[in-house]
Amino acid sequence: KEDKMKYIDQLTSLKNRNYLNENIASWNKNTIYPQATIIIDLNQVRNINDTLGYEQGDAQIKAAANVLIKTQLDNTDIMRTDGNEYLIYLVGYQEKQVVSYIRKLYKEFKNLPYEHGAAIGYSMITNDMKTIEDSINESVEDMRTKKEEIEEEKDEK
């Protein structure tokens, strides 16, 4: 039981970064394609922590985790990899299915307390030329681009 706890994020009950690190090697050997990684970065959590307190920030992180649990697809792993960041690893989904799932997540995240939403990036793996690490890095880049777009939209309002 204690061993299992090593892989569980205490706040959200999702799997954690230890779980990711432990599984990356075997995921890289997986020959079922396509695969995808999705990175989700909750917007404004630091701001919530600073203005409303950590309890509210934690509540936001938990609420987002609950959305991910509620909408989880088969053959996927969901991890909280950082304070306000989540990673989803998917096996056997076409890109249009991944995009449609992300759209659903955007919609769900709009209903979180404080309505700050999230920035979501993804990357597809279609053969063994791309590693999980590469895919995660591409997902992070994609997410950062989305985050900049969100910031620009805010500035224009």
Where are these regions (language model features)?
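Short beta-strand-to-loop capping motifs
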Residues: 88-93, 124-126
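Beta-strand residues that line the small-molecule/cofactor-binding core
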Residues: 19, 115-117
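A structural signal for short, well-ordered beta-strand segments
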Residues: 37, 86, 118-122
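Catalytic-core segments of nucleotide cyclases and related cyclic-nucleotide turnover enzymes
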Residues: 54, 99-110, 119, 125-157
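Conserved long alpha-helical elements within nucleotide-processing catalytic cores of c-di-GMP signaling
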Residues: 4-7, 16-36, 43-70, 79-88, ...
